[in-house]
C-alpha cells in the first residue's frame, strides 16, 4: 500500500502529514488525533481502511507534537483551538480536500465539533466521533465518578493533587496510571507497534490546552461546551466508544441524544481505544460506514 509523507507549510511552522493509498473518486477520510499532543501514531492501525473502503486515509500531527513543529516557547498563543482549527483548514486547502469524511478521536472529536459548529465548513460528508465529548464539564464529572471505584488510597492521592495543584507525587502518579490503565488502554508489549511508539513532544500542548490529566480540565479548553449546539449538525454522524472508556456511556449518549442524524456503536470491554482493542471489528464498521455515506 502506498504511503506518502508530506510537510505542509503552516505560517512559520509546518505540519507533518501521512497519506495512505492513492486518490480515488471517493472522499478521503481525514483523521484528527487526540491529546492535544498525542500525535498520529496510533492511527496507523487503521491503514487498511484505505484499501477496504477504496479511498485515501489521511492523518497528520497537530501543531505541538510528533513530526510537526513544536513551538513550546509560544505555547499560550500556539496551543489553542483557534490555531488547531486554522491548521486543519490549512491541511484541507494544501491537499485540495474539497470533500472529506472527518474522524476525531478524543480531543480530535472536540476539534471536529468546534470546526463544524463554529466555522461551518463545506464538504464534510460524514462525521465519526471516536471516544470523544461535547462537554468538558460532563467529562470531568463522569471521570470523577469513575475515580470513586479506585482504592481509597489512590482516591486520596488524586484528591490531594487536585487540591494542592502538585501533580508530581509518586502516589498521585501511580494512582493516575492505574486509572488510565483501566479506562484509556492498558499498555502491554503485545500492542501494535504504532501504539507503543514513543511520541515526540506533546506534553506542553496537552497541559496548555487541557490540563495535568484527563479529569482536571484547567487549560484553555476548560470551558468547552457544545452539547446544545449538536442539534444544528444534520450531517450523518457515527459515535464509537467502549464500555470502560474515559468516554463513558453517558458521555457518548449525551452526544447521540443531541445529534439529529447519529448512530452509536458501543464496544463491550473496550477502553478509550476500541479501534486498537477491537481493531478488525472497528475497521469493518468504519469501512462499511464510509462506503454507505459516499
UniProtKB/Swiss-Prot annotation:
Q: Give the enzyme class.
A: hydrolase
Task: Tell me the superkingdom of the source.
Answer: Bacteria
Give the UniProt keywords, A-Z: Aminopeptidase, Hydrolase, Protease
**Active site (catalytic residues):** 106, 245, 272
UniProt cross-references to Pfam families, sorted A to Z: Abhydrolase_1 (PF00561)
Subcellular location per the Swiss-Prot or TrEMBL entry: Cell envelope
Query: What catalytic activity does the UniProt entry give for this protein?
Result: Release of N-terminal proline from a peptide
- What job does the chain carry out? Releases the N-terminal proline from various substrates. Cleaves Pro-betaNA (L-prolyl-beta-naphthylamide) effectively.
| Family recorded in the similarity comment | Belongs to the peptidase S33 family.
Subunit details for this protein? Answer: Homotrimer.
Q: Report what the protein is called.
A: Proline iminopeptidase
Organism encoding this protein: Lactobacillus delbrueckii subsp. lactis
Amino acid at each position: 500500500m502506498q504511503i506518502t509523507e508530506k510537510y505542509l507549510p503552516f505560517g512559520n511552522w509546518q505540519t507533518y502529514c501521512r497519506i495512505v493509498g492513492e486518490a480515488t473518486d471517493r472522499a478521503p477520510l481525514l483523521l484528527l488525533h487526540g491529546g492535544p499532543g498525542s500525535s498520529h501514531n496510533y492511527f496507523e492501525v487503521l491503514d487498511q481502511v484505505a484499501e477496504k473502503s477504496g479511498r485515501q486515509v489521511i492523518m497528520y500531527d497537530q501543531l505541538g507534537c510528533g513530526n510537526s513543529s513544536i513551538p513550546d516557547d509560544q505555547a499560550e498563543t500556539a496551543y489553542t483551538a483557534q490555531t488547531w482549527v486554522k491548521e486543519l483548514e490549512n491541511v484541507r486547502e494544501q491537499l485540495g480536500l474539497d470533500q472529506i469524511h472527518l474522524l476525531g478521536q478524543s480531543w480530535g472529536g472536540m476539534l471536529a465539533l468546534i470546526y463544524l459548529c463554529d466555522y461551518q465548513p463545506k464538504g464534510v460528508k460524514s462525521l465519526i466521533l471516536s471516544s470523544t465529548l461535547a462537554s468538558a464539564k460532563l467529562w470531568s464529572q463522569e471521570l470523577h465518578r469513575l475515580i470513586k471505584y479506585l482504592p481509597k488510597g489512590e482516591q486520596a492521592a488524586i484528591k490531594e493533587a487536585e487540591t494542592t495543584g502538585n501533580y508530581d507525587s509518586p502516589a498521585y502518579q501511580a494512582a493516575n496510571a492505574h486509572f488510565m490503565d483501566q479506562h484509556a488502554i492498558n499498555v502491554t508489549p503485545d500492542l501494535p507497534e504504532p501504539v507503543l511508539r514513543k511520541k515526540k513532544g506533546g506534553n506542553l500542548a496537552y497541559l496548555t490546552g487541557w490540563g495535568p490529566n484527563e479529569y482536571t480540565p484547567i487549560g484553555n479548553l476548560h470551558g468547552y461546551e457544545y452539547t446544545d449546539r449538536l442539534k444544528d449538525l444534520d450531517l450523518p454522524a457515527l459515535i464509537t466508544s467502549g464500555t470502560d472508556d474515559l468516554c463513558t456511556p453517558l458521555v457518548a449518549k449525551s452526544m447521540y441524544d443531541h445529534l439529529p442524524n447519529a448512530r452509536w456503536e458501543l464496544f463491550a470491554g473496550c477502553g478509550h481505544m476500541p479501534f486498537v482493542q477491537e481493531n478488525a471489528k472497528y475497521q469493518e464498521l468504519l469501512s462499511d460506514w464510509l462506503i454507505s455515506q459516499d
